[in-house]
Amino acid sequence: MSRPRLLPEPVGLKFVTQETPPDWDAEFGFSGPLELEIGSGAGGHALEYCRRHPEVRFVAFEWRKKYARDTQDRADKAGLRNLRVIESDARFIVPRIFAPDSLAAIHLQFPDPWWKRSHAKRAVIQPAFAELLYGKLAPGGLFDMRTDVQDRGVTMLAILESVGFKNPLGSGVFHPYDPEEVPSTRERRYLASGEPVYRARLLKPA
């Protein structure tokens, strides 16, 4: 009788089990800006961003096993030592592993596959989590949000502004497309097809 095949450990398991922030300098082997991505998906944004910004220490959350493992594997093979992928729900881990005012930027990539109005209670950006993220971001830090669902984008923008994030373009205004920004795998499809993407680039006051 053959033995059952053991499943590999989740990517970034050591971070999932930590109760306090790790020594990020020791983890990455260098110091530099620390950035968080929630919802890295297929990894297009995280991988390209880390290629363009080798000075940044980038921590990406993705709860889908295939995407999380594939992204970390591709980063390792490409020699990107500045990317760590965590295969888990960011809402439960972020509160424990990042100190207050420690993040230079937060990237929120096309969250919430449950896009119907009746699914709003499942949305990642709720007031309590938005307030927590605000506390983790350093003064002057950037919150970069992108979604393809306009109603959800309007709601998230309102929540984020309500907890203190400032919109340089004015309250409730989405940010226009900037070709210098790094698109995600999903965003590239929308850019190619001409479908709209709703973006916001918010700041925490210095």
From Swiss-Prot:
Keywords: Methyltransferase, S-adenosyl-L-methionine, Transferase, tRNA processing. One of its GO terms (cellular component) is tRNA methyltransferase complex. The active site is at D112. It comes from the Bacteria. Coiled coil: none annotated. GO terms for molecular function: tRNA (guanine(46)-N7)-methyltransferase activity. It catalyses: guanosine(46) in tRNA + S-adenosyl-L-methionine = N(7)-methylguanosine(46) in tRNA + S-adenosyl-L-homocysteine. The keyword S-adenosyl-L-methionine applies. Substrate binds at K116, D148. S-adenosyl-L-methionine binds at E37, E62, D89, D112. Pathway: tRNA modification; N(7)-methylguanine-tRNA biosynthesis. Its EC number is 2.1.1.33. InterPro entries: SAM-dependent_MTases_sf, tRNA_(Gua-N-7)_MeTrfase_Trmb, tRNA_methyltr_TrmB_bact. It is an enzyme of class 2 (transferase). Catalyzes the formation of N(7)-methylguanine at position 46 (m7G46) in tRNA. Belongs to the class I-like SAM-binding methyltransferase superfamily. TrmB family. This is tRNA (guanine-N(7)-)-methyltransferase. It comes from Myxococcus xanthus (strain DK1622).
